[in-house]
């Protein structure tokens, strides 16, 4: 009988990427088949996130549900990973003694050994260490799941913003070797992936070693990824303004594969609040980056993150945030009311903004950005947009659906052979959450760049350095 694995994932795109790697890894080592039904699984894994409020309580609530399954099947293995696991460690078992495996974001590659340990000894195991980049050399070859894919290029963050747990849960910044990243993307391109999203907690701080011992900057990596034949759309998430240098901005001038959409978190428009957050930049410096981006790529749309009601935030501070939103004209945002994260410097500050005031400010901010986004959508009416066709429409199986560079969903009439390819469509209707288009050009009528074939990248010889980190030499 096939053994089943169920993974529940909360949080960021990095967690989604990690969960996909867990599934691939345990599929290759133990033959586990992924299931959406927890009740039929032999192994249950919870990949957690500590960003949102009451993250720990959410974890224990879910584990309580799984305890009932463990009572019915004592051989069931329950594991907790991700950032809450990294924060709480063995303390998780103090409240949930039935948890068998506790692992951090940097030790998911050791899951096969951990599961073997539990099965062989009937005793729990905890591993929340930070073995730097080792995990990427222990993971199986990537498997494409549609025309888009996430690829992690670095982990951790050195910025230590006062509100953020990332440096404590994922460690400091470590970049994957450049050729390791290119090899993974080439493998995905050979399987039909057309769009890659490069991931990192501070992705534009990437500085990966090359096969000859040099350092590849993030700007250089973007150009190398875009040069792989078949990869015709490149995104990246998430960036920090103080690392958004002119050499990265210049890529927008000469690399058409890099999308005209950027997520660049600012958190607040108040310099006073930015200082308390230890963001190391001002609102004016942020706007200077945006101006340079618009000069390099006219029409680029910007999204951001905002924390509302940070300790000490006044009405005047909030009004400065609203002014920044109007000045930059953000297209979308991930915005939340502030809640303290245990172990961060901000958790020791007096949380003096009333909860109702936080919620009111959040409503005003989100309403402003929603209206701005709708204006951008209406401006697309009558224009021709290039979309990557991802599959059938959620609205009708008789139609197809894809996304524009600026992440708008477009539904249109098409043929199944268009799935996984690019088409140009004229936007004929604008709705709140989607657009409607008519096909005007198919991929065989486009002049997409061809530079380096995936096979030429894959053909590189794999080597390991003195600490066992893999790289690929031409």
UniProtKB/Swiss-Prot annotation:
Textual note on the cofactor: Binds 2 [4Fe-4S] clusters. One cluster is coordinated with 3 cysteines and an exchangeable S-adenosyl-L-methionine.
Annotated localization: Cytoplasm
Known cofactor(s): [4Fe-4S] cluster
GO cellular component assignments: cytosol
Entries under InterPro entries matching the protein: Elp3/MiaA/NifB-like_rSAM, Methylthiotransferase, Methylthiotransferase_CS, Methylthiotransferase_N, Methylthiotransferase_N_sf, MiaB_methiolase, rSAM, rSAM_horseshoe
Keywords: 4Fe-4S, Cytoplasm, Iron, Iron-sulfur, Metal-binding, S-adenosyl-L-methionine, Transferase, tRNA processing
Enzyme Commission number(s): 2.8.4.3
Annotated [4Fe-4S] cluster 1 binding sites: 12, 49, 83
Positions bound to [4Fe-4S] cluster 2: 157, 161, 164
Catalytic activity: N(6)-dimethylallyladenosine(37) in tRNA + (sulfur carrier)-SH + AH2 + 2 S-adenosyl-L-methionine = 2-methylsulfanyl-N(6)-dimethylallyladenosine(37) in tRNA + (sulfur carrier)-H + 5'-deoxyadenosine + L-methionine + A + S-adenosyl-L-homocysteine + 2 H(+)
Start and end residues of each TRAM domain: 378-441
Gene Ontology MF term list: 4 iron, 4 sulfur cluster binding; metal ion binding; N6-isopentenyladenosine methylthiotransferase activity
Alphabetical list of PANTHER family matching this protein: CDK5 REGULATORY SUBUNIT-ASSOCIATED PROTEIN 1, MITOCHONDRIAL TRNA METHYLTHIOTRANSFERASE CDK5RAP1
Function: Catalyzes the methylthiolation of N6-(dimethylallyl)adenosine (i(6)A), leading to the formation of 2-methylthio-N6-(dimethylallyl)adenosine (ms(2)i(6)A) at position 37 in tRNAs that read codons beginning with uridine.
Subunit structure: Monomer.
Protein name, entry field: tRNA-2-methylthio-N(6)-dimethylallyladenosine synthase
């Amino acid at each position: 009988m096939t053994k089943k694995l169920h993974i529940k994932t909360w949080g960021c795109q990095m967690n989604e990427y990690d969960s996909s790697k867990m599934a691939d890894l345990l599929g290759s080592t133990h033959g586990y088949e992924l299931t959406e039904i927890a009740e039929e699984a032999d192994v249950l894994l919870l990949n957690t996130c500590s960003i949102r409020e009451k993250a720990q309580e959410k974890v224990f609530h879910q584990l309580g549900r799984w305890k009932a399954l463990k009572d019915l099947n004592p051989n069931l293995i329950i594991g907790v990973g991700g950032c809450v696991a990294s924060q709480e460690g063995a303390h998780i078992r103090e409240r949930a003694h039935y948890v068998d495996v506790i692992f951090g974001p940097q030790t998911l590659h050791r899951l096969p050994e951990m599961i073997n340990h539990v099965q062989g000894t009937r005793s729990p195991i905890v591993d929340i260490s930070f073995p730097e980049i080792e995990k990427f050399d222990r993971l199986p070859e990537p498997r494409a799941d549609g025309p888009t894919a996430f690829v992690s290029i670095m982990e951790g963050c050195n910025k230590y913003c006062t509100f953020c747990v990332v440096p404590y849960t994922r460690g400091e910044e470590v970049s994957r070797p450049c050729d390791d990243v290119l090899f993974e993307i080439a493998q995905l391109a050979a399987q039909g992936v057309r769009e890659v999203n490069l991931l990192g907690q501070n992705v534009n701080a990437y500085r990966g070693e090359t096969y000859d011992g040099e350092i590849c900057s993030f700007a250089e990596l973007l150009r190398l990824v875009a040069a792989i034949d078949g990869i015709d759309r490149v995104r990246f998430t998430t960036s920090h303004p103080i690392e958004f240098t002119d050499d990265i901005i210049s890529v927008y001038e000469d690399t058409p594969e890099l999308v005209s959409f950027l997520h660049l978190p600012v958190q607040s428009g108040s310099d006073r609040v930015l200082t308390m957050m230890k963001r190391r930049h001002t609102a004016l410096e942020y706007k200077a980056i945006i101006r340079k981006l618009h000069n390099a790529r006219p029409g680029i749309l910007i999204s951001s993150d905002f924390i509302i009601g940070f300790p000490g935030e006044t009405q005047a501070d909030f009004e400065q945030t609203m002014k920044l939103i109007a000045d930059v004209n953000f297209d979308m945002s991930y915005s939340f009311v502030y809640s303290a994260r245990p172990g961060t410097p901000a958790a020791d500050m007096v949380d003096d903004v009333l909860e109702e005031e936080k919620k009111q400010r959040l409503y005003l901010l989100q309403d402003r950005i929603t209206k701005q986004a709708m204006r951008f959508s209406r401006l697309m009416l009558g224009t021709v947009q290039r979309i990557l066709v991802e599959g059938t429409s959620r609205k009708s199986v008789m139609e197809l659906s894809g996304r524009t560079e600026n992440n708008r969903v477009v539904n249109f009439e098409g043929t199944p052979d268009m799935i996984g390819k690019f088409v140009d469509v004229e936007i004929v209707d604008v709705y709140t959450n989607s657009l409607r288009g008519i096909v005007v050009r198919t991929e065989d009528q486009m002049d997409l760049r061809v530079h380096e074939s995936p096979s030429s990248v894959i053909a590189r010889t794999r080597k390991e350095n003195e600490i066992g980190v893999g790289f690929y030499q031409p």
